[in-house]
From Swiss-Prot:
Acts as a component of the essential kinetochore-associated NDC80 complex, which is required for chromosome segregation and spindle checkpoint activity. Required for kinetochore integrity and the organization of stable microtubule binding sites in the outer plate of the kinetochore. The NDC80 complex synergistically enhances the affinity of the SKA1 complex for microtubules and may allow the NDC80 complex to track depolymerizing microtubules. One of its GO terms (cellular component) is nucleus. One of its GO terms (biological process) is cell division. It is found in: Nucleus; Chromosome, Centromere, Kinetochore. The keyword Cell cycle applies. Signal peptide: none annotated. Residues 61-144 form a coiled coil. This is Kinetochore protein Spc25. The keyword Ribonucleoprotein does not apply. Keywords: Cell cycle, Cell division, Centromere, Chromosome, Coiled coil, Kinetochore, Mitosis, Nucleus.
Amino acid sequence: MSALKMDDEQSLNVYMQEFRTRFINKSSDEMTSQALKESYKESAATDAWFKKYRDGELMIEKVLEFRNEITLQNKRIEEKQKNILQEAAKQDDHEQLKGELTERIQRLREELNQKREVALANRKANKERIKELQKSATLFKERLGLEIRKLRGDKLQFVFRCINPKDLDQPYSCIISLNAEGDYEVAGCDPPLECIAEFQEKIRETRNFSALLANLRKSFTALGSQVK
């Protein structure tokens, strides 16, 4: 009976040992499986967060690149605007200078036209005076032996004769002309007269051409009377 009891105890011990082993193995397997599950979950979560982190970094990089591109584009736009403003300023200066030159040219044209009109009027008046001189000269020629010769440049040469009693055909001449201002100029007297400047000033004041010719003849007559 005691032998049977020992066998039962041994059998119980063996059974308990096997149960303990199976329990430990099962617990270990369950723990390992749970650990693997937790590890997988943790790994999956880590991968998800890493992916989000990486996506965030990529997004930040793209944002920075986009911001840098915008900054660069803004600089280019500012440079273009600056260049455009400079060109516009140059154009404004050019237009202003062009306007000033146009006004100056217009003023010069007006002044030139005025001077041209004055010159034409003076020339017309000179021609009228020359005609009057020629008429007066005809009368003087008939009465006083005066000859009038037309020279180049609207100049007239007055030749007096019948002055020297010893030689009535001896010529005494003087050249009279009109300048651009329409004033008389007396020059080229042969023989020379000392009172030419006085006669010229007087004719410019009085416009009395007949008196000028009379004074010239008197001066030549006085000069001729001195000839022996």
